[in-house]
């Protein structure tokens, strides 16, 4: 056995084991803890190695501008998964600079159409790219005053109560939603508009209370405006397949008809449209811009 060094410390503790007592083994364990000076050559070499490793790691990192340039090109669903990578990634994705870059980048992508059909006490939301099969998103309960729904950058704001005092904002890209604080509006129907403030880079909801409106006669077409300024015209009633949407460009004075497949063929059982409770188109939206809200 080697001789114990002078700068070592001997620590003893006892333990109980049946096997050691049977064979006459002492119940004392000697542990040698080496005390190494902080100024010893071995410690100095270890510290130098760690410092060199940190320098090499920092030099291997990509510039922040290049990281944001890569992230802005990814889909919103992919960025939502990247939030769990680290706190650094989460702060980068949630930063205001990346959100503005992402909005600008997504505006160049192909647009999507959103349809909200109502049957009796339910509203059904569908989304579809131009000339593609519609995809069912979710169902929300409809009240007697479900006549207001606002939309911007893929975010849909709608009310869940009779007077729309409880508002929900739904992100169609990440399929996540948040419920806004309830607003007291008992004797008036609440009107709300969802908008985007490009200066501060935030989304805002404008709420107004107006007297109850008398329900007007059902119109034949629903309309809205795309990000490019085209007017959207969609039939209010669910016709025989295929379902179609008309685009009108006021600058070029041109009209184009787009067929949307899948709303009646694949979702007729879901809507359960009958003559007594026909399906009615309540809203139609168009969006080319995605949002990173609720990330």
Curated annotation (Swiss-Prot):
Ranges where the F-box domain occurs:
56-102
Q: Which InterPro entries match?
A: F-box-assoc_interact_dom (IPR017451), F-box-like_dom_sf (IPR036047), F-box_dom (IPR001810)
Mind telling me which SUPFAM superfamilies this protein's record contains? F-box domain
Which Cys residues form disulphide pairs?
Answer: none
UniProt xrefs under Pfam families: F-box
PANTHER family per UniProt:
BNAA05G37150D PROTEIN-RELATED, F-BOX ASSOCIATED UBIQUITINATION EFFECTOR FAMILY PROTEIN
Q: From the Swiss-Prot or TrEMBL record, give the protein name.
A: Putative F-box protein At5g44220
């Amino acid at each position: 056995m080697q001789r114990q060094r002078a700068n070592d410390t001997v620590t003893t503790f006892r333990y109980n084991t049946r096997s050691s007592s049977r064979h006459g083994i002492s119940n004392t364990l000697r542990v040698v803890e080496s005390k190494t000076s902080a100024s010893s050559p071995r410690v100095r070499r270890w510290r130098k190695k760690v410092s060199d490793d940190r320098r090499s790691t920092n030099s291997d990192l990509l510039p922040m501008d290049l990281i944001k340039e890569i992230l802005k090109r990814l889909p919103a669903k992919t960025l939502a998964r990247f939030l769990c990578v680290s706190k650094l990634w989460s702060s980068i994705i949630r930063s205001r600079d990346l959100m503005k870059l992402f909005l600008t980048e997504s505006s160049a992508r192909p647009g999507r159409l959103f349809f909200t059909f109502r049957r009796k006490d339910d509203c059904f939301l569908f989304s579809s790219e131009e000339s593609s099969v519609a995809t069912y998103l979710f169902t929300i309960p409809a009240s007697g005053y479900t006549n207001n729904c606002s939309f911007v950058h893929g975010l849909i704001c709608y009310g869940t109560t009779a007077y729309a005092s409880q508002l929900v904002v739904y992100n169609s890209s990440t399929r996540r939603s948040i419920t806004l604080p309830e607003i007291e509006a008992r004797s008036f129907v609440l009107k709300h508009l969802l908008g985007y403030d490009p200066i501060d880079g935030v989304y805002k909801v404008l709420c107004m209370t107006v007297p109850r409106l008398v329900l007007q006669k059902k119109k034949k077409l629903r309309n809205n405006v795309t990000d490019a300024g085209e007017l959207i015209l969609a039939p209010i009633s669910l016709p025989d397949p295929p379902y179609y949407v008309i685009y009108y460009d006021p600058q070029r004075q041109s009209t184009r008809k787009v067929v949307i497949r899948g709303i009646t063929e694949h979702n007729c059982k879901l809507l359960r449209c009958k003559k007594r409770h026909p399906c009615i188109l309540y809203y139609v939206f168009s969006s080319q811009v995605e949002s990173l809200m609720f990330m």
